[in-house]
Amino acid sequence: ALEQRCIDPRFTYVKRGCAPYVEWLGIQENPSGAGWAAGKGYGNKILDILSNILETGEREEDMNIIKMLAKKNCYPGQNKPAYVVIHETDNWSRGADAKAHATAMKNGNLAGTVHYYVDSGSIYQTLDHKDGAWAVGDGGGRYGITNRNSINIEICVNPESDYYKAVDKAEQLAASLLKQYGWGTDRLKRHYDASRKHCPRRIQDEGLWPEFKRKTAAYMGTAPEKPT
């Protein structure tokens, strides 16, 4: 019997009929015989994927979410999510994309923090959902949405990013989060709803919020709640 079945190069999958299902995890063709053999990192990859599913309820590759989790400028372990809140960065500098903001946040260089940054090409997760962001505290909890009961998504507006594609990715992400928690679009809010701040600015200025909620509901496969 093989002692390390997950990494032994002699372990083939063809006999078990499951090669098509494990190939994408890093399986390599077995040079010493017919079939497929697990590479060295196979076991760890399985554990990483299972860990992510347990933590977020989503396979990361489905949303192409890149994790760059910060532990600064937040409320560790104090968030009990009840809302998904949409923001915009208001940062029009070239290069101010999702990765740049995520890096700055991880390094502790941003006073305001969120759980996700989205641009037209990528999504970065920057806080665990159980950690509260410094995102809507300016509302002082007057409207029921706080830093300790919300998941916050920031849409990047840098000029080289396609803004409307970024908005679409944010709609998909919001839909995924709402489905994960079993919520309807009545739990989808703007920063404005939490504090009356004019944010997300461009969505507000262009009157896009009803469409944002409609498309989010469509991605969820449901009808939108009453617009707010």
Model-identified regions with their sequence ranges:
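Alpha-helical segment that forms one wall of the substrate-binding/catalytic cleft
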Residues: 1-16, 164-178
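Surface-exposed intrinsically disordered loops and tails
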Residues: 10-33
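Basic/polar, cationic surfaces and motifs that engage anionic cell-wall
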Residues: 25-71, 76-78, 148, 156-228
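Active-site-adjacent loop/helix surface patches within enzyme catalytic domains
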Residues: 61-184
